């Protein structure tokens, strides 16, 4: 009897899913609008989501990664670093691979208004001579790399490499609702070859399965989760459909087509798509997105937002993404973002050099509709309709 109980406990331990709650907050864009600063920001920062995936230059020890993509980010979680633990609010970003937070080495105003990691207060911190630089448009966040214990939910990830900022551009981060970024993409795109957090978790045997899953609730504040080491079927309906990863860097897949009312409007001969929790909107080629915006009646306001009449939502068609032979419809209630009496399009155009071909970014607008499993063991994504 005792052996049966022990075996049952062992089986249960192997199925533990470590759930990390995410909170939905006002985005940096909304904060800048409220402060009357968005127009000034956009004069010197031209958001182009493509720069996140195709940085202009890469160095051996100093890497680049655009920060404008986080202008619309709304989902954030809490982690801790060091001994005793120091808490930070981060974006769990499947479109990048590094972990970085502000530090006491940073004297920028943006750092002063956010939580800063103090290595002198941590008995487990180990410094390095390696550097990190992340571009944001007209300037950059610079920092150094170090090692320490990182706690994510109930998981204690020891000897984790991460970035400590030394300078941060004020306007970009001053009103940001997050302290740093926790990247969940493949190690091949990690700056300075730093081991990503999830890879370290798996290497140390801290998760029972080499995968994690994401549920983004449509609720205004609570209910969203990142689940490490497992899948919870109570967050989706039907069965998971699996899609092979086409490039083991980002969570990139091949998409068959994009259609409206049965007519293909983009990606006619298949194209590439990246599933990215760090991108709030659904992004595609500028011409295709422009055509869709016109079709649904969206028009730009003075702040550069594509506004639309809220009364039109019920009459607008689904945008259908066909992936690996399966159709994933996105209703207007998903791609039109409603706040109070204002409605804006959740679609955004981006410019990509022609040699890369047609590329789409399936951001939070898509992930809210479809529970997503990021399966590293089999290099595949699982998609199912979210509850």
From Swiss-Prot:
Phosphoserine, modified sites: 129
Gene3D superfamilies referenced in this protein's UniProt entry, alphabetically: 6.10.140.60, Acid Proteases
Keyword terms of this UniProt record: Aspartyl protease, Digestion, Disulfide bond, Hydrolase, Phosphoprotein, Protease, Secreted, Signal, Zymogen
Database matches in CDD domains: pepsin_A
PANTHER family per the UniProt record, alphabetical: BETA-SITE APP-CLEAVING ENZYME, ISOFORM A-RELATED, PEPSIN A-3-RELATED
Similarity section: Belongs to the peptidase A1 family.
Free-text function comment from the UniProt entry: Shows particularly broad specificity; although bonds involving phenylalanine and leucine are preferred, many others are also cleaved to some extent.
Name this protein carries in UniProt: Pepsin II-2/3
Taxonomic classification: Eukaryota, Metazoa, Chordata, Craniata, Vertebrata
């Amino acid at each position: 009897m005792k052996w049966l109980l022990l075996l049952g406990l062992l089986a249960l331990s192997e199925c533990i899913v470590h759930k990390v709650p995410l909170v939905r907050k006002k985005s940096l864009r909304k904060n800048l609008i409220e402060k009357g600063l968005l127009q000034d920001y956009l004069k010197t920062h031209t958001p182009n989501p493509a720069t996140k995936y195709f940085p202009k230059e890469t160095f051996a020890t100093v890497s680049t990664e655009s920060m404008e993509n986080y202008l619309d980010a709304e989902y954030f979680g809490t982690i801790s670093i060091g001994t005793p633990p120091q808490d930070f609010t981060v974006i769990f970003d499947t479109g990048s691979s590094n972990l970085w937070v502000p530090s006491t080495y940073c004297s920028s105003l943006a750092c002063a208004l956010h939580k800063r990691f103090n290595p002198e207060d941590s008995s487990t911190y180990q410094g390095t001579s390696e550097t990190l630089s992340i571009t944001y448009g007209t300037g950059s966040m610079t920092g150094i790399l170090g090692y320490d214990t990182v706690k994510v939910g109930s998981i204690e990830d020891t000897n984790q490499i991460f970035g400590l900022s030394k300078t941060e551009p004020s306007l970009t981060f001053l009103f940001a609702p997050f302290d740093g970024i926790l990247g969940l993409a493949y190690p091949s795109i990690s700056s300075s070859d730093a081991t990503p957090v999830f890879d370290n978790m798996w290497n140390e045997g801290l998760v029972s399965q080499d995968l994690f899953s994401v549920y983004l609730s449509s609720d205004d504040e609570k209910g969203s989760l990142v689940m490490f080491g497992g899948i919870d079927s109570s967050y989706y309906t039907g069965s998971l459909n699996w899609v092979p990863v086409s490039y083991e860097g980002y969570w990139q897949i091949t998409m068959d087509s994009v259609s409206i009312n049965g007519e293909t409007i983009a990606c006619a001969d298949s194209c590439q798509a990246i599933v990215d929790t760090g991108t709030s909107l659904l992004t595609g080629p500028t011409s295709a997105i422009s055509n869709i915006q016109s079709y649904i009646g969206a028009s730009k306001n003075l702040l550069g937002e594509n506004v639309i009449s809220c009364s039109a939502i019920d009459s607008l068609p689904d945008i259908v993404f066909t992936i690996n032979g399966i159709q994933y419809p996105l209703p207007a209630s998903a791609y039109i973002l409603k706040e109070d009496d204002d409605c804006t399009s959740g679609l955004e155009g981006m410019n990509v050099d022609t040699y890369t071909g047609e590329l789409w970014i399936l951001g939070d607008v898509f992930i809210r509709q479809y529970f997503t499993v990021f399966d590293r063991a089999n290099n595949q994504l699982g998609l199912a309709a979210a509850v």
